[in-house]
Amino acid sequence: FRDILNDNHMGGQSYDFMMASGKLQALCYKHEIEKTLRTPDYAGFQLLALNDYSGQGTALVGVLDVFFEEKGYINAEQFRRFCSPTVPLARIPKFVYANDETFHADIEVSHFGAAPLQGAKTSYTIKDKFGKVYAKGTVGTQTIPIGNLCALGSVDMNLKEIDTPQKLNLEVCIEGSDAVNDWDFWVYPAQVELTQGSVYTTDTLDAVSYTHLRAHETAA
């Protein structure tokens, strides 16, 4: 793999490629595992391996390297957010919103701990990447039985306060335990003023396109 990158003049980008593909891998694991935990009467799931396989050839497919050490794009604490005995879950219809919409999430929990969680209080926070809190509150307080698909409540947030493109994060935690999980979503202005400027945009190479290209060549 190193030689292939070097032959294509990308040897210096090895770390960037690993981090990009690794973050995507971790996100896929998160969504796949959460999907199984949200499925009624699902009997469980199995992961073939968590580490890279270096036997007959090389398969760099693990979230850990061949020595069972972290690669740098996800750690044990982050993995346990969506893969542990107690996992808060969210049913979110979509992850991209306009600011004239309302964000909504139905909150559930998958709990296969040693005993039910008596009088468990579930809270939530919505914040941006800088830590600014836009909304927070309590989802509900109830005893959480052993099993999956225990409904806890819902979260709603009017997005009109968001007037610039933002990535926000919903975090849900069950107080008094280490059960916490989070999800990113994106908000964009519903109305955007477009400035034509000097950039010509087209998906067809026609006479008008050639005119703009020739004008650019003349100016250059």
What are these regions (language model features)?
Residues I162-Q191:
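Terminal connector regions
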